[in-house]
Amino acid sequence: MLARNNSLVTEFILAGLTDHPEFRQPLFFLFLVIYIVTMVGNLGLITLFGLNSHLHTPMYYFLFNLSFIDLCYSSVFTPKMLMNFVSKKNIISNVGCMTRLFFFLFFVISECYMLTSMAYDRYVAICNPLLYKVTMSHQVCSMLTFAAYIMGLAGATAHTGCMLRLTFCSANIINHYLCDILPLLQLSCTSTYVNEVVVLIVVGTNITVPSCTILISYVFIVTSILHIKSTQGRSKAFSTCSSHVIALSLFFGSAAFMYIKYSSGSMEQGKVSSVFYTNVVPMLNPLIYSLRNKDVKVALRKALIKIQRRNIF
């Protein structure tokens, strides 16, 4: 039962992506296709990396984790989003909302630092190729990955913990298709000052540290590439980084655009722009890394040949 005036909210209503009933069915099929492509693409990459020993390198180790994060990240809210397109009342419990918020933030922040680790990996590969195997040892890769998940856990715990201290009275309609920080803060009937400070600190840290690390890494990378005399060597070095640069641009660019829309006070535009950040980016990542990567394409071709041979015999 939904909360009444002067009572504490135990359930929320997700406003969803659109108020127009005629758009719900087309949007359901659109996001179902996006979700299926995301699942197949990321599961496919995870399987390829697991079965092909020549892909057991630092670069593909980070890419394996990136695919795992995208897989989980997309599964946090997309099934509920699809259900909301076909159900009359988009109700979610307080506990369910906070749980989804926690895992959403955990995977988003972890992906941020995983992309940062990949930038450092590219820096070592291009700027210090002779020391690459020593510098990017299995132990170092494991530590960087562990650090990415720890940062995700810390950020998600801080945000969700502060959200749990808020009281929600009569307003219970979340103007979004998922439980996110800013739409929830608007519903609180108690002071959100602490939450706003935490948002400032956590978001500031999770933007500044990765951005500076990535920027410094690519300054050194570009400088090293420009010092390569042969055109072929320079082209090979650029192609090594191109997929990662595209992934970085999509992730950080769409996130920045989404929060610019939110900060301008336009919740409707904010939640529409967040579709690209939350749904499209996890779908595009496996396509970017598979279509532009020779090793992945070779591994995929071999896997398809094996499947064809099994079907024949």
Swiss-Prot record:
Matching Pfam families: 7tm_4 (PF13853)
Disulfide linkage: 97-189
GO (cellular component) term, any one: plasma membrane
Membrane topology: Multi-pass membrane protein
Glycosylation sites: 5
SUPFAM superfamilies named in the record: Family A G protein-coupled receptor-like
A GO biological-process term: G protein-coupled receptor signaling pathway
Keyword line: Cell membrane, Disulfide bond, G-protein coupled receptor, Glycoprotein, Membrane, Olfaction, Receptor, Sensory transduction, Transducer, Transmembrane, Transmembrane helix
Membrane-traversing stretches: 26-46, 55-75, 100-120, 140-160, 198-217, 238-258, 271-291
Localisation: Cell membrane
Gene3D superfamilies, per database record: Rhodopsin 7-helix transmembrane proteins (1.20.1070.10)
Side of membrane Cytoplasmic, spans: 47-54, 121-139, 218-237, 292-313
Residue numbers on the Extracellular membrane side: 1-25, 76-99, 161-197, 259-270
Record's function text: Odorant receptor.
Family membership noted in the UniProt record: Belongs to the G-protein coupled receptor 1 family.
Protein name per the record: Olfactory receptor 8B2
Taxonomic source organism: Homo sapiens
